[in-house]
């Protein structure tokens, strides 16, 4: 802007155009400069307004420029007011949400992810004593106290968890050395020598630009990691050996820092713990899946009860020319003896139980053959007695020489 106290209408238009351009561009981001220019223009204009040329075209351009500046200023003011209002609403909503969250759950300080584990203090101690992760009795008692205190501060999620004891902490360190891979590195890259392992860990931490605890004067002149690995392996170090060591080291550090629980989720441990608890009355029973279902046990069919009724028995050797069904015959000693008289006569003398019977008391030659001559030379054959009761008069009159015989005329 010109320093001349007198101003022309053309210079006035140029001054307004310059202010508009700087206001819209605002590269310098210095509002006081624009304010000073506007104040200077405002002071010069009233004194020289009467001496300005009345050029309608220039005056129209001045009106258009001032209108554009006015619209831009109002737009900037509206945007600024809207931004302030939205920011205030966002702050209020965030504060309200935080108050609601704090009211529904206990306040837990901002902690790292690994601190949510019950073994946080034990992992931290393991990580700080990698060269010799064997805590003393005093350190064990301190870790137990810190772990129990931090567990009690977490809240209701693990209230039912029993407090940690010293022997449990000892077992945890034994398992941690094995599961993390520390024992594997000790065996493979330190010859199972804890002194060599100590120097190897120090060299690794030093090569990784990590803080290492101060160590006394070492008997090893070199502090190079490759030299330690080559010396412990007893041979020149190969790229495969170095890569294997780096992989084992990274796996060990990852397990110590994060553990398994944070990788797979808390629900795995909760599920395992719930499966070991005895179900309480009223609690839903676990559903047996197909994989857990036992195969159905094959049971023998129930045995049918044996009938106590005696089946009728018959002689296995029927008489000659007999056509009767032997299954309907009555089982008697006389019947059996008569049916076998012609073929097994010699067996009567050898059977003690049959010695009391005399089938030939009415004649020794009457039963020499199954057939004999009767009235009118009619042939008579001996048949087995049917099941039934004989008439007593027939036996007394001698019509039937023996109880087991019946006469049939042919």
Swiss-Prot record:
Transcription regulation found in the keyword field: no
Compositional bias segments (type: Polar residues): 312-335
Taxonomic lineage: Eukaryota, Fungi, Dikarya, Basidiomycota, Ustilaginomycotina
Known role: The B locus has at least 25 alleles, and any combination of two different B alleles yields a multimeric regulatory protein, that activates genes responsible for the pathogenicity and for the sexual development of the fungus within the corn plant.
Protein source organism: Mycosarcoma maydis (Corn smut fungus)
GO BP terms: regulation of DNA-templated transcription
Name the UniProt record assigns to this protein: Mating-type locus allele B4 protein
Sequence ranges of Basic residues compositional bias: 294-307, 375-388
Record keywords, A-Z: DNA-binding, Homeobox, Nucleus
Subcellular location: Nucleus
